[in-house]
């Protein structure tokens, strides 16, 4: 039986079995195993409760004289459905093939334009794929037939070979043209600027690939931001060690009257809730950015699946979507709140139940030689927490850190002090200092102290000062303090960093 041409049929009436028509449902005669349709079984049975098989005369008893009580032959029904599915697949493949032929796409590589047809393989192939597939000796004898691009709808017999570059035609999705369109005064593309169709396609595919790569890069950054925000939120847990330390600070530095302690703890918890709420709002903003990116990525993926000719027609739509990913979908840098461990519990002396959680200033200090800034802070501050290395300088709390956890993430209270000696003359040292400043997006404030500042420096120092001035214009958070050679200047730098 040819499965693509015939369906299983009843051996008595010759009609095809069908589950949709009651009389054509295949029924099994259980005593002998033969199958006939429901209609034939009813006719043979008549008024009797016994049916004799028309093929071998073996009798089968029917319960309550109802032939529908006989079991269906599901094997035949499954074969019928499989045949139907296979026919539908063949039709679908043929329709798909026609669509690809219409758009001139290579069957092996949809990014390429088909230029040859193989009748034996029933495939449209570009020159590269033809050579690769037919390099095997058993396929080398296949006949190659040249195929052309679709004809122009306005000039029959002329193949589409050009693409209109006018913005108006892009927006109207009317870009495909032949050589006659350019010369015909009645044409929509008369004397329009144009490009070759075969040059346009690779450029569009490259734009798709680069924008998808940029999407994955931005997605990674946003997910990193969300992860960092969640890490900080976790530090504010009431069951965590940092919050337990804050409650101890409250008990250690302030005496509360009877009944005030519980109220003070409640006020402290409310402060925590406020900070967590801000962090959660920042996460929701990052998620909105991610959703916008994903929406545009999905649009590009959908466009990339189009046949080449349709993709060329919709270039304007592709360009707009790519622009949204490349320019409009900037990764917003969240201004992270300090985590719970770096916050100080501050109780106002006049109002003991007005409690604040204030982040300690975290200072990263990069000095060229003598660590004068570190020594000044150590001599003019009081250590209030050995565990978290918190110092009190005047009325402010600060912590000296070695380096930031992530130089690309802005963080509350994070400050940088950099001291540069202009008499050093070391070009590499100047270059490293500038490089560090350019990448210092994480810092809330940056103080650059210049030692031995005077007119008439060497070439290396002069170049450094010029580039530093440019950086200062681009990054207002940079403050420059000159002539850092006395303790008063060091004090000015420290005070400048924590205001």
Curated annotation (Swiss-Prot):
Zinc finger (RING-type): 10-57
InterPro entries in the cross-refs: E3_ubiquitin-ligase_RING, Znf_B-box, Znf_RING, Znf_RING/FYVE/PHD, Znf_RING_CS
GO molecular function: zinc ion binding
SUPFAM superfamilies, alphabetized: RING/U-box
Keyword Metal-binding: yes
The entry's keywords: Metal-binding, Zinc, Zinc-finger
The keyword Zinc-finger belongs to this UniProt entry's keyword annotation: yes
Pfam family for this entry, one: zf-RING_5
Zinc finger feature spans (B box-type): 101-147
CDD domains xref list: Bbox2_TRIM23_C-IX_rpt1 (cd19773), mRING-HC-C3HC3D_arc-1-like (cd23124)
Record-given protein name: Uncharacterized RING finger protein ZK945.4
Organism encoding this protein: Caenorhabditis elegans
